[in-house]
Design a protein with these regions (language model features):
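Multi-pass alpha-helical transmembrane bundles in non-GPCR membrane proteins
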Residues: 3-205
Length: 206
């Protein structure tokens, strides 16, 4: 019995030592800064949404986006800032699951504000990404591998599914006088994919 307990203790120690102290501090501070910037940006976005052409739709979509974004940053900050133990392992699952919510939340304004009347593209992609996000979030509470390639592929697939509607997205953004937003979206997606590739590699960067 003692040996079993000792082995379990060593297992928990290994599971909770994925990052060294420098990496944990860097992750905690960077995601904490994301919370602060997200709250500030959220206030600005909500104010603009309320003063826009379709204020009810705009405020609702921005609220969903902020929920997804902040849930990701809050869960990651809490996870990396917590002490090793069972709580940290639970927070790790929330951290991974919240990425799905972040991706789906980011899609919401583009699908329901920009492409809501684009022949079914808006509602179709909205339904797909949110169904994927809910399923992904639930599955995140299964036992996670240290670097799950399947999980990374799911993140990238969700993020890239907008490519099937690239033409209607560009056209509707242009009609709204927001053409440059398309390139910001592409830049953000490319940055995310590059980051996902680096994350999936079993390499220490410190």
């Amino acid at each position: 019995m003692y040996l079993c307990g000792s082995n379990q203790s060593r297992k928990e120690t290994l599971e909770n030592k994925r990052y060294n102290n420098v990496e944990e501090w860097a992750n905690t501070l960077s995601h904490g800064a994301g919370i602060l910037l997200g709250v500030i940006a959220g206030y600005v976005l909500l104010a603009k949404a309320a003063a826009g052409v379709e204020p009810k739709w705009a405020v609702a979509c921005v609220t969903v986006y902020l929920f997804g974004m902040l849930s990701s940053y809050v869960s990651s900050t809490w996870y990396h800032g917590s002490r090793p133990g069972k709580l940290k392992e639970l927070l790790r699952k929330f951290d991974h699951g919240a990425i799905y919510l972040h991706i789906a939340g980011t899609y919401t304004p583009f699908t329901l504000l920009v492409m809501r009347h684009a022949g079914g593209w808006g509602w179709g992609i909205f339904s797909f990404v949110w169904l994927s996000a809910i399923v992904g979030f639930i599955l995140s509470f299964k036992k996670l591998k240290e670097h799950s390639n399947l999980e990374t592929i799911c993140y990238i697939a969700m993020g890239a599914c907008i490519l099937v509607a690239m033409k209607p997205l560009m056209d509707h953004l242009a009609e709204m006088g927001a053409g440059p937003a398309f390139w910001w979206l592409i830049g953000g997606g490319a940055s995310y994919i590059i980051g996902a590739v680096f994350y999936s590699l079993p390499v220490s960067y410190t």
